[in-house]
Every structure is written in C-alpha cells, then in structure tokens.
C-alpha cells in the first residue's frame, strides 16, 4: 500500500470517518486504509484477514460496509447423498462450512446410510416469505374497522404491493392480529428464487402507505409504527413460524429395514425411537424449546455459511420436528422443517466463494430455489439420522474422542 499516513492521521483525529474512504478511493485502497486504521486503534497487526479472493468492489456495493478484509471458515463436503425429490434428483455432494469438528463426518455418515437405503424422499410443502407491520389506530373499534377494510380490499392492496417488484406476488394477508388498538397484519408473498426479505419489506411498506391514505379518506386514523412488527417472524424462534411456516417448508424422509439399522447404525429401531421421544419431544417440551430435533441448526448453519444465505435465519431453520417411528420391518425416519428462508439469487449468493458452493449443487441462479430447498432438507435428514443413531448406540462421545475433538 502506498503511504497514506496523512489520511490515517485524519482518521485517528476524527476528521475523516472510515465510511468516507469509499468515496475518496477505490474499494481496494479504502479497505486497506481502514484495516491499517483498526491496526493502529487496537494495537495489532492483521496477517490473515487481508488474504482473500473475493471482489471488494462488488462486496462493498451489495454485502458489507466499512470492509477491512474477509474471514475464512473451513469448508468440507458430505456425500454423495441420493435424493428423490421433485426438483432435486440424483446424488449430491453437500458443501458444509464449519469450525465444529466431527460435524462433517457425522453428516457424511448419514449421507452414506441414506444412499445405501435407497435415498431420501423430499418435498417442499409450502413456499412463502412474510412481513407483518405494526399499525396503530385510536381504539379497538377502529382496529376492527381497519382489519375488515384490509380483508375487503385485498385485491387493491395486492396491486399496490406488487407494483414494487417483478417477482413478488402477494398471496394473502393473514392472520391479522389485534392487540389493544394495534394491528399486526401478516403479509404473505411468493418471492421466486430470492429469499425475498428486501422485496417483501419494500412491497409491504408501499401497501401500508396505501392503507393509511385510503382510510384517512374514510375518517379513520391509522399509522404504520414499524414496517416490521415482529409477527413476521424474522430472525427469531417463533411458534408462529413453527405452525404456519416461513420461507421454504420442507419434509424429508427415509425408510430403513431393521437389518439396515443394525448394520449401519449399530443399534435398533426401537432404541432410536426411544431417544427421539425422550430427547427431542420430552426434553424439548420441558425446556420450552421449539426445536423438537437433535441438531438441525448444525447442518442449516454449515450450509447457510457455505452458500451465502442470511446467517441470522439459522435460528429459524433450527425449528422443526424429527419423527422416528418403528414399523414391523424397520424404521420410518423424517424431518419436518417449517421455516427455511433461502434463495439462489441475490444477497450473499453473489459472493464468489458462496456462488461456487451453490454451483457445486447445481443450484445457482434462477429456477433453482426449490431444488436447493430439497437438498437442504435431505442434508438435515442425514445429520439428524446419524446423530440419533450415535446417541442410541452410545457412540457419540467415542466418535468425538476418536476424531480428537
């Protein structure tokens, strides 16, 4: 880097703000100067975050502010995993970015077992993105009038909302919750291959402005307090999303004969079903958890980081129910994930390393989101089967010990 000591001095003196460098220099130089600024501020020398291959200019336009470098997370793969989906058909290698030792090995074992047993059957049972603003009125009487007006004028609201986007389609506005004199209408959209949060926020905001204006003509006061009123529910664990779904809602299942359970998991169907009942149902219930599963978040998190999804949505992907049912001749095993917000275009999917991981799955770009969702569901199934099998067989501690974790 050239000598920019005068710029650094002005930054240290507060004369130049770090974000102002983007307009003064190109993206690469601005990033380097900010990095030097932090080094001087905290008294360390960066040796690793300065080494990366992603395009700073593109990242700074779309993904990050005050950029000083990039971090690296170890990337492995699990597979092949045979998937019998509606959109994902065949064998896939699953990219997993994680610093948790033994995770990839566990998912890989699950992939191997599922593939040997005929593959995972996967379906996306629902597909939507939601935004629920908070609307304030003068009384509960007015709140009811606003609720009824929204329902009666849905088609007009739909036209206004959809005028902001080429891809978003407003499907419904339900439920419309009333608390005191406030309303929380849940706008439900189809968003194509984008995860869609920005899309639905912009559309909902315009719809709210329309609602305010039209009701003002009728002498009813209504004010949008916040375009997101937390009934969406975005980036938080939620009973609303567990029941009603958000993003992609996915079910993945596999059937193993008793012989296959004995051979590959070194345990019995009955033992796995008991672990699932006492751990995932009873244990989750007494702790008031909404994740009736062993570790969906592990697989969701590793895939999200690898493929450029919004990492804050990992908490939503952690919701769901694992089923392990003993049949006469074996084990029916399934995972139900009601809330997986994902996309194959936009956001972090543009970042070069994340784009390559989506390409590894054949899932980058348009018309790929449902295929990607089925792959995610199958990968979670693999991770869940492997862990519950290890717990039932009493092998979990041994596995971590052998892998030196």
UniProtKB/Swiss-Prot annotation:
It comes from the Archaea. Pathway: Metabolic intermediate biosynthesis; (R)-mevalonate biosynthesis; (R)-mevalonate from acetyl-CoA: step 3/3. Its EC number is 1.1.1.34. Converts HMG-CoA to mevalonate. The keyword ATP-binding does not apply. One of its GO terms (molecular function) is hydroxymethylglutaryl-CoA reductase (NADPH) activity. The keyword Hydrolase does not apply. This is 3-hydroxy-3-methylglutaryl-coenzyme A reductase.
């Amino acid at each position: 880097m050239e000598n920019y000591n005068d710029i650094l001095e002005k930054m240290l003196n507060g004369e130049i703000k770090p974000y102002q460098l983007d307009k003064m220099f190109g993206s690469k130089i601005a990033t380097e100067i900010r990095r030097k600024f932090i080094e001087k501020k905290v008294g360390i020398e960066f040796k690793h975050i300065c080494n990366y291959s992603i395009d700073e200019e593109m990242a700074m336009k779309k993904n990050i502010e005050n950029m000083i470098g990039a971090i690296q997370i170890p990337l492995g793969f699990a597979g092949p995993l045979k998937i019998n989906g509606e959109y994902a058909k065949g064998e896939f290698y699953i990219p997993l970015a994680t610093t948790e030792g033994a995770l990839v090995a566990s998912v890989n074992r699950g992939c191997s077992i599922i593939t040997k047993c005929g593959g995972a059957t996967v379906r996306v049972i629902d597909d939507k993105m939601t935004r629920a603003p908070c609307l304030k009125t003068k009384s509960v009487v007015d709140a009811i009038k606003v609720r009824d007006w929204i329902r009666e004028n849905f088609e007009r609201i739909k036209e206004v909302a959809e005028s902001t986007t080429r891809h978003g389609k407003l499907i419904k506005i339900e439920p419309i919750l009333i608390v005191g004199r406030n309303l929380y209408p849940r706008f439900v959209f189809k968003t194509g291959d984008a995860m869609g949060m920005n899309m639905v926020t912009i559309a909902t905001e315009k719809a709210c402005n329309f609602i305010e204006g039209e009701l003002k003509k009728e002498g009813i006061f209504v004010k949008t307090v916040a375009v997101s009123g937390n009934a969406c529910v975005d980036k938080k664990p939620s009973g609303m999303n567990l029941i009603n779904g958000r993003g992609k809602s996915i079910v993945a299942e596999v059937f193993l004969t008793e012989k296959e359970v004995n051979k590959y998991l070194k345990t019995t169907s009955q033992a796995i079903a008991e672990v699932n009942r006492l751990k995932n149902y009873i244990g989750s219930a007494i702790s008031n958890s909404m994740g009736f599963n062993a570790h969906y978040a592990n697989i969701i998190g590793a895939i999200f980081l690898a493929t450029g999804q919004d990492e804050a949505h990992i908490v939503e992907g952690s919701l769901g129910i694992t089923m392990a049912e003993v049949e006469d001749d074996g084990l029916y095993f399934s995972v139900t994930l009601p809330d997986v917000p994902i996309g194959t275009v936009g956001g972090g999917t543009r970042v070069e390393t994340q784009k390559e991981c989506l390409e590894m799955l054949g899932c980058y770009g348009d018309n790929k989101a449902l295929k990607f969702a089925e792959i995610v569901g199958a990968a979670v199934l693999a991770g869940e089967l492997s862990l519950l099998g290890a717990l039932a067989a009493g092998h979990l501690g041994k596995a971590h010990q052998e892998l030196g974790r």
